[in-house]
């Protein structure tokens, strides 16, 4: 699931280098063939394929393997658990890693956990994820309960 080239010591030459993700990405046709196989395996009609993204459980920008089958999955594009939000969370986490405010391991753990907690509880100005329980989503639920209480 992880790219062995990306370590805490190599982040300046890998994920923090502009253009890194594009440089290591497999050809588009190869990725689309994999997506088509996954859609078929799940019984999703090819006509509905545009509603789904080929997701990397650990995004390339956080040291995930660009092409390992164990790192690939499907996510809907839209919604609270959608790829659009996950991609934004990954970019925020990458910024924090590259600024030295989070370790690579912390960012990877956050994105493979309940990453939607990171998306909703993460501040653009702060890289503090210590209050976010990415394993259970507890902080996210507490915040939602407070906002709906009379």
Predicted regions and their residues:
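Structured segments of extracytoplasmic/periplasmic soluble domains
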Residues: 37-45, 60-61, 75-82, 92, ...
